[in-house]
UniProtKB/Swiss-Prot annotation:
This is Teratocyte protein CftICK-I. Residues 1-19 form the signal peptide. Keywords: Antimicrobial, Disulfide bond, Fungicide, Secreted, Signal. Its main location: secreted. The presence of a 'disulfide through disulfide knot' structurally defines this protein as a knottin. This endoparasitoid wasp peptide has immununosuppressive, antimicrobial and insecticidal activities. Suppress cellular immunity which is detectable as a reduction of hemocyte encapsulation in the host. Shows potent antifungal activity against C.albicans (MIC~0.25 ug/ml). In vivo, ingestion of this peptide (probably at excessive doses) increases larval mortality and reduces leaf consumption of D.saccharalis, a permissive host for C.flavipes. The keyword Kinase does not apply. The keyword Secreted applies.
Length: 52
């Protein structure tokens, strides 16, 4: 039971880490941020970019 609980926590952390590797569409992004999940980082104005 103890090992199962540890395994479950490891899986959750792995999923969270993978989820943070990309930015959802319509969210702010930059050249140093993770890549967009779908599409590219598109400039909206001078200092504002969103994933499109």
């Amino acid at each position: 039971m103890y090992k199962l609980c540890i395994l479950f926590l490891v899986v959750i952390f792995a999923v969270m880490a993978i989820a943070k590797e990309c930015i959802p569409s319509n969210q702010q992004c930059s050249t140093i941020s993770p890549p967009c999940c779908s599409g590219n980082c598109v400039l909206q104005g001078k200092h504002f970019s969103i994933c499109a």
